[in-house]
Amino acid sequence: PQEQMTMEAYTTITGEIPEGGVSPVLYEIQRSRFLAYAVHAEDEEAVRTWLQGVKKEHYEARHVPYAMVLGARSDRQRSSDDGEPGGTAGSPILEAIKARNMTNTAVAVVRYFGGIKLGAGGLIRAYAHAAGLGLDAAAKIRMTPLRPLYVQIDYDLLAAAERYIREASVQTEETSYADVVTLTLLIPTGDIELHQRALTDLTAGRARYRLGAQRYVAVPLA
């Protein structure tokens, strides 16, 4: 199907929005304190509920602007200045997410005003910097479209096949041991032929193959 052809890898933050919240990253400039929260998000409603919790916790803060980018193709983008001058808060937060090519990600920045006005340019820089710090501190994963290649082999070929998989750094899932061994390899669509050829050579043509449907697999980012 067409859909399978167009799946593209994307980077996001690990995990659901945690019940206990996430630890914010603090950035201070000219006595204004900015607390940046970055979370994984796939649903606008869930983000709004989470935002209410952040605002409740920081009820003394004057502004809690936010931005979110949702969808594997980053096609849903929202931002709010939450009372800051137009374009000085939500927009730079959104740009910080986009600059890192991230999606399914929401960032809220709580600002405690320190009595010194930062000016429009100062606000834009401060919100962009705070959002960037929050995003950079968050644990991230790369959601990568891979296809399962099921490889059936006899037991006498297992050691050689496992050595090949290790050396080729192929991601695997559970192996099933029955009358024959079924290895599950997770491979980018473009590399399937290459690995099939190598395994066919290695097993002198005794390996049998079946392809599964392409799906997203989470690969942790260091």
Model segments located where?
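Terminal, non-globular segments
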Residues: 185, 191-192
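Active-site beta-strand/loop microenvironment that shapes enzyme catalytic pockets
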Residues: 89-137
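Short glycine-/aliphatic-rich beta-strand segments at the starts of folded cytosolic domains
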Residues: 140-157, 183-185
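C-terminal regulatory domains involved in ligand/effector binding and gene-expression control
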Residues: 5-87, 210-222
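Short, structured loop/turn "capping" segments at alpha-beta junctions
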Residues: 103-107, 134-146, 159, 174-175
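Conserved short beta-strand edge segments in small beta-sheet-based binding/regulatory domains
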Residues: 172-177, 203-220
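Short amphipathic alpha-helices in soluble, non-transmembrane regions
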Residues: 162-167, 195-203
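Short amphipathic alpha-helix segments
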Residues: 152-170
